[in-house]
């Protein structure tokens, strides 16, 4: 479900998966050539598309979970370059604007796991 209570469409999921895969390969091969950032260590965990497919919220996490804020800040800084390289890989009428966000799901899962372990003791 989206914020407005509307279900996510199949098209949003398909485009999100396509962008997720393309970004993963782009980061793995370091095709964007971003200065001061090793993109081989960045994991794209999820891509959420807006209903009009004009914006993409990209959840990222560096391997090891170190310097997450710094990595997200640099990705935001170079989002134009990443979008330009991505446009050569994905054929769409409009490539969405990319918004990079820190993925907290691993921290949240670890917190819940610790709570479960505490209740079992």
What is the role of each PLM region?
Residues 1-55, 61-121:
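Charge-rich, low-complexity N-terminal segments
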């Amino acid at each position: 479900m989206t914020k407005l209570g509307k279900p996510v469409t199949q098209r949003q999921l398909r485009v999100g998966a396509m962008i997720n895969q393309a970004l993963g390969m782009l980061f793995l091969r370091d095709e964007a050539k971003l200065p001061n950032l090793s993109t081989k260590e960045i994991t794209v965990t999820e891509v959420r598309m807006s209903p009009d497919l004009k914006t993409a919220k990209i959840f990222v996490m560096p391997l090891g979970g170190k310097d997450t804020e710094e990595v997200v800040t640099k990705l935001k800084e170079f989002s134009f370059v990443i979008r330009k390289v991505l446009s050569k890989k994905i054929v769409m009428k409009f490539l969405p604007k990319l918004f990079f966000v820190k993925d907290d799901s691993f921290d949240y899962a670890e917190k819940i796991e610790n709570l479960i372990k505490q209740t079992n003791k």
